[in-house]
């Protein structure tokens, strides 16, 4: 069985490394002001993949922390995926030109699905669709808005579009260390033939152990942020557990 990929997260707000509680910009905890140094620390612990979010961009609808992301890409030898504020093809192309491996598109996946499908067809393996859920419904605009579209229905729209993965985030758990919503993540993987990345609520090594058997069900990896920053999860241990 393939390994469960561990994606340490770097969320950027005004150039700083932060974590939000439930996607609320007013509930941000600052963990550092040198994103590149944080990326190097993750690499030193064995990380081969990195998940970066331009939080200001997610709310503004355009890239805001470009310089910080560039510094991360320069510092991290593995693959970097970036999301936040990517609403058009120019935004996708700009990140890819900087060396980003995969671009995550969330809000635009709901509001402009044809753009996402076109990008996925033109750029195989480079587009990840962010499926952000609050009580089973799709949340957009930095999670500030909740739509009337069910998560499964949004995912199915991209079944044959060639997207690299679906990034499923349970917004109600994100940054709260409540534990990953394994059941909902596995359920989503069960309705589409697209790899799914779990996100939101990872509290410790038990979440890695819970997700690991479901690689066979289509779970590609898991994103973890606050558990790492708060010392509740050791990255090297998580990577080893994901590969065990």
UniProtKB/Swiss-Prot annotation:
Keyword Cytoplasm: yes
Active site (catalytic residues): 11, 132
Pathway: Amino-acid biosynthesis; L-histidine biosynthesis; L-histidine from 5-phospho-alpha-D-ribose 1-diphosphate: step 4/9
Keyword tRNA-binding: no
Broad class of enzyme this protein falls into: isomerase
GO CC annotation: cytoplasm
EC number: 5.3.1.16
Alphabetized GO MF terms: 1-(5-phosphoribosyl)-5-[(5-phosphoribosylamino)methylideneamino]imidazole-4-carboxamide isomerase activity
GO biological process: L-histidine biosynthetic process; L-tryptophan biosynthetic process
Cellular localization per UniProt: Cytoplasm
Record HAMAP family: HisA (MF_01014)
Family membership noted in the UniProt record: Belongs to the HisA/HisF family.
Listed name of the protein: 1-(5-phosphoribosyl)-5-[(5-phosphoribosylamino)methylideneamino] imidazole-4-carboxamide isomerase
Source organism of this protein record: Sphingopyxis alaskensis (strain DSM 13593 / LMG 18877 / RB2256)
Taxonomic lineage: Bacteria, Pseudomonadati, Pseudomonadota, Alphaproteobacteria, Sphingomonadales
Gene it is expressed from: hisA
């Amino acid at each position: 069985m393939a390994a469960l990929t561990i994606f340490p997260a770097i969320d950027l707000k005004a150039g700083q490394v932060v974590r939000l509680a439930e996607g609320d910009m007013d509930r941000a905890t600052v963990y550092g002001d040198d994103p590149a140094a944080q990326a190097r620390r993750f690499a030193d612990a064995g990380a081969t993949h990195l998940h970066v979010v331009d939080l200001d961009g997610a709310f503004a609808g355009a890239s805001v922390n470009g310089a910080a992301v560039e510094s991360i890409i320069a510092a991290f030898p593995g693959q970097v995926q970036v999301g936040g504020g990517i609403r058009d093809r120019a935004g996708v192309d700009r990140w890819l030109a900087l060396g980003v491996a995969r671009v995550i598109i969330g809000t635009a996946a709901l509001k402009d699905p044809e753009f996402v499908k076109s990008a996925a067809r033109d750029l195989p393996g480079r587009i990840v669709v962010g499926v952000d859920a609050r009580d089973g419904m799709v949340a957009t605009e930095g999670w500030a808005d909740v739509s009337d579209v069910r998560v499964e229905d949004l995912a199915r729209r991209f079944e044959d579009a060639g997207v690299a993965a679906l990034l499923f985030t349970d917004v109600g758990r994100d940054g709260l260390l409540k534990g990953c919503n394994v059941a909902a993540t596995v359920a989503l993987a069960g309705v589409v033939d697209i790899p799914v990345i779990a996100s939101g609520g990872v509290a410790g090594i038990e979440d890695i152990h819970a997700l690991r058997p479901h690689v066979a069900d289509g779970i590609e990896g898991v994103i973890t942020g606050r558990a790492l920053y708060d010392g509740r999860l050791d990255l090297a241990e998580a990577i080893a557990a994901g590969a065990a």
